[in-house]
UniProtKB/Swiss-Prot annotation:
Entry protein name: Galactokinase
Site (Transition state stabilizer): residue numbering on this chain: 47
Taxonomic superkingdom: Eukaryota
GO cellular component: cytosol
UniProt organism field: Candida maltosa
InterPro entries, alphabetized: Galactokinase (IPR000705), Galactokinase_CS (IPR019741), GalKase_N (IPR019539), GHMP_kinase_N_dom (IPR006204), GHMP_knse_ATP-bd_CS (IPR006203), Ribosomal_Su5_D2-typ_SF (IPR020568), Ribsml_uS5_D2-typ_fold_subgr (IPR014721)
Amino acid sequence: MSISTVDDLSFYSNVEPNQQRFTEVVKTFQTNFPGDDITFFARSPGRVNLIGDHIDYNFFPVLPMAIANDVIAAVNVNSTNEIIITNTDSKDFLKEVIALRNSQIDQEHHSWANYFKCALIVAKQYLEERGVTSLKGMKLTFNGNVPTGGGLSSSAAFCVASTLAIIRANGITDLTKQDLTRITVVSEHYVGVNTGGMDQCASVCGEPDKLLLI
C-alpha cells in the first residue's frame, strides 16, 4: 500500500484548529525563507498504546493506534548542498543547518537536529537502494502538537515525517507503507533509543478508529 496524498484537511476530525496550524507553518516558513516556495507538506501522527508498553522490542505483541496529534512540515526542495530545519516553536527548537555530506550525529550536541539526522541516515540508505545517490537540498519548517515526553511517540512522529519528506524530495513517489515502516523502525537507534517498531508502525499504518495488533 502506497503512502497517500491529500487535497484538503478533511482527514482531521476537527479541521479548524489544524487549519490554523498549517497557516502558522506557512507563515513561519515564509518568514524563515522569504522568496522560497513550499513544494509540499509532510505529516506523521503520534500514537497511543493500549496494551503492551515497552515489550515490542522483546518481540511481544502490542496494541497501539494512531492519534490525531501529529507532526507536520512545510518542505522546500532545492539544489543546495544542505538541509535547513526550523520550527514554529523557535525558542525550544532552534534553526539548524545540516550538510548533506555529513549526517554524522554528534552525541555531545543535544539537539532536535540529531533526530532529523536519524531520518536522513535511513532515508539515504533507502534512496541508494532505489538508485538515488545525489540528494537534494531542503528547507523545512516543522510544527508538532504531540506532547514531548508524553508517551505518545513525538520523536517517532518527527522521524517518520522527516524520512517521508526526504524521500519525497528526492523524487520517490511510490514509497510503500511497508518500506517506510521498515526503514524508520531503526532510525532512532542512531541516537541510542531502543525501539522495537511499534511507534513507527502505528504512525505509518494507523487508520481512523482502528487498533493495530503488532
